């Protein structure tokens, strides 16, 4: 009992009479890129694997539909993917460590042993190149304006890229972003119930979709890409927060080189948010996030615009105008992306297409 009484007295001594308790710490900003970027509530936001948004049977059916869309291009896409694979693998320049005690016998140094029989055998070991220590994230705009041919293009693009890069030992992550509802969803309902505070910031429920994590094999996640064909999935696009989410996921990865590729068809739009905030609210945040990612240089950022000029946002950008151009364009861009021949190591050499 005495010990308990002492403990209670100690607690009282720590809080002198008349002093107010300490204020709780200020909440962390929603965005690393802009501490003034506001979100009315994150309560209804969702980060979800694609397989949780549809039953397996439906995913297989949707994937079959996507394959149908791809059928006219399948031969050309496969040929270009194989060509890209050969080019990438040829760029994985071999380098060796010599004079090792074990490994592959170094035939080039056998002459030394003939000249001096007491010289021990020399072995060599192949060094891993940085090329393999790479992860690529593909961030897909899943907004309503992508419905129809553009979303098929994006899904096909993701499919070809994931298969080809996986064969070259490059990890690939495929993410998508949209909202759970039109017209603000539960976030707007909560805002209305709470008295319509002025300039509430982002006012819709985010839906961030993981189609393929970097460590998951393409074969296992293949049906997930069919989800993009699902009626009612594609809604609003809040690009800045999606880009920041993808960037956060990437910087936690162990790979030395990180490439983040965004595929989009327009500027960020969310009617609920823009109706109660400045007209450029979401676009400004996207520009701020891009500036942060490009400044930090932990991740190489590149954008592909589908019928949309993304060069006004991103330093490294390319425009694709139609699916028929997609296979050739993406082959060239990926080959440039992984061009290891430059004096300064890996570099990007993107050009605008279309």
Predicted features and spans:
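Acidic, glycine-rich A-domain
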Residues: 3-354
């Amino acid at each position: 009992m005495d010990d308990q009484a002492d403990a209670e007295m100690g607690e009282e001594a720590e809080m002198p009479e008349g002093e107010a308790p300490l204020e709780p710490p200020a909440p962390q900003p929603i965005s690393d890129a802009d501490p003034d970027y506001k979100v009315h509530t994150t309560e209804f936001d969702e980060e979800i694997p694609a397989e949780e948004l549809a039953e397996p049977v439906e995913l297989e059916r949707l994937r079959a539909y996507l394959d149908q869309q791809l059928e006219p291009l399948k031969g050309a896409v496969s040929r270009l993917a194989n060509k890209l694979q050969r080019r990438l693998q040829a760029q994985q320049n071999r380098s060796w460590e010599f004079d090792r005690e074990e490994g592959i016998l170094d035939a080039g140094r056998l002459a030394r042993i003939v000249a001096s029989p007491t010289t021990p055998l020399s072995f060599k070991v192949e060094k891993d190149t940085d090329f393999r220590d790479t992860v690529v994230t593909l961030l897909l705009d899943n907004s309503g304006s992508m419905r129809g041919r553009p979303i098929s293009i994006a899904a096909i693009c993701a499919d070809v890229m994931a298969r080809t890069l996986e064969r070259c030992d490059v990890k690939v992550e495929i993410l998508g972003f949209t909202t759970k509802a039109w017209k603000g969803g539960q976030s707007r309902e909560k805002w209305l119930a709470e008295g319509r505070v002025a300039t509430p910031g982002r006012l819709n429920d985010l839906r961030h979709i993981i189609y393929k994590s970097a460590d998951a094999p393409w074969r296992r996640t293949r049906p997930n890409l069919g989800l993009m064909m699902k009626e009612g999935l594609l809604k609003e696009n809040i690009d800045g927060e999606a880009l920041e989410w993808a960037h956060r996921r990437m910087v936690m990865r162990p790979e030395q080189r990180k490439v983040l590729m965004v595929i989009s068809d327009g500027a960020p739009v969310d009617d609920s948010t823009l109706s109660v905030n400045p007209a450029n609210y979401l676009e400004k945040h996207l520009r701020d996030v891009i500036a942060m990612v490009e400044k930090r240089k932990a991740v190489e950022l590149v954008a592909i615009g589908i019928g949309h000029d993304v060069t006004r946002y991103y330093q490294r950008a390319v425009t694709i105008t139609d699916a028929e151009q997609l296979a050739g364009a993406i082959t060239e861009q990926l080959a440039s992306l992984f061009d290891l021949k430059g004096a300064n190591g890996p570099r990007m050499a993107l050009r605008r297409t279309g």
